[in-house]
Amino acid sequence: MKKAIFFDMNETLLNLSLLKKQFEKHFEDAFVLKYWFTKLLYASTVVGAMGDYTNFGALSGATLETLFVESGKELTPETKNEILSAFRHLPAYEDVIVSLKRLKAEGLKTIAVSNSSLAMVKEQLTNAGILDLFDAYYSVDAVKRYRNGCYTRLGSLWR
């Protein structure tokens, strides 16, 4: 039997440091990134709990717009694009490449899973230099359910 390990991407494999710089630039406070990302994950959880689905890119943008409104700042289309496009170029954490190679050497399959679109997943893995270390990668867009909903469904199959 082949064994596989599934990896979340953002904050697990990929370092949000580039996003941190964007939030420091626009809010003078890097902590705002954590607030925004928490709001984004919360929004995806609520949407999923309602049995609905919204593309994660659109949800990211809407959450960013809300954050700017809450902060009394204007979000131009250029600024929005600048911040959100940083997602495409997140570096892998220092230990990721060595760890993935070790898992591959042990014969384990490695699979990346993300709320982002499939094109975005491939672009992120490519830009981080780790695409070739994965046997497969998936986006929740294929099933129109966020990962938390997918995990719930998978868990019910094991009962």
Task: Identify the meaning behind each predicted range.
Residues M1-L41:
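Active-site neighborhood of HAD-like aspartate-dependent phosphohydrolases
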Residues Q22, S44-A49, M120-K122:
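A short acidic, helix-capping loop that chelates divalent metal ions and anchors anionic groups
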Residues T45-N81:
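A metal-dependent, Asp-based hydrolase signature
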Residues G57-A58, L75-A112, K122, R147:
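Short, acidic loop-to-helix structural element flanking the phosphoryl-transfer center
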